[in-house]
Design a protein with these regions (language model features):
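C-terminal edge-of-domain segments
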Residues: 127-147
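Generic structural "secondary-structure junction" signal
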Residues: 25, 59, 120-123, 134
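Extended, charged amphipathic interaction segments
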Residues: 102-125
Length: 147
């Protein structure tokens, strides 16, 4: 992961990035899809409600055996991933405050990509070992001041 996923940044923007976090790629993709385009403060409130298990994140991808929630369809409460996204949004909020941007910030880009893969082994019977792979996740966000 060299740079950001967008090439041209808007005039008044703030950005932040978290690299190689140990969270689920599938849950992170669904959270990013849900929060993209929302206001920054409203996105933080949504993540607080997800961590309190009051609001579910609607899933649009990776829907195998995902239970339906009342009013939104298939969804879950990914608490661990929500904590990481909350940290990311707090970081970009601090960056925007440092740049002197106002409080009216909108998330224009929120992307998730796979990071480094860690190869691990689990012991099996008869002295064998089975490999399993752990994907790490890169997150990045760009917010713009709304007029």
């Amino acid at each position: 992961m060299k740079g950001y996923s967008i090439d041209k940044f808007p005039e008044k923007h703030a950005r932040s990035r978290i690299r190689e976090e140990d969270i689920s790629v599938k849950d992170a993709v669904n959270i990013a899809h849900f929060l993209r385009g929302k206001k920054l403060e409203s996105a933080k409130d949504i993540l607080d409600n997800v961590m309190a298990k009051k609001t579910a994140i609607p899933y649009f991808r990776y829907l195998d055996s995902i239970s339906h929630r009342k009013g939104i369809g298939p969804g879950r409460y990914p608490v661990k991933e929500s904590k990481v996204f909350k940290k990311l949004l707090d970081d970009v909020s601090a960056n925007a405050e440092f740049k002197g941007l106002s409080e009216n910030l909108v998330i224009v880009s929120l992307s998730v990509s796979k990071g480094r893969m860690i190869k691990k082994f689990t012991p099996k019977a008869y002295g064998r070992a089975g490999a399993f792979f752990k994907d790490l996740v890169n997150l990045e966000v760009v917010v713009v001041e709304e007029e």
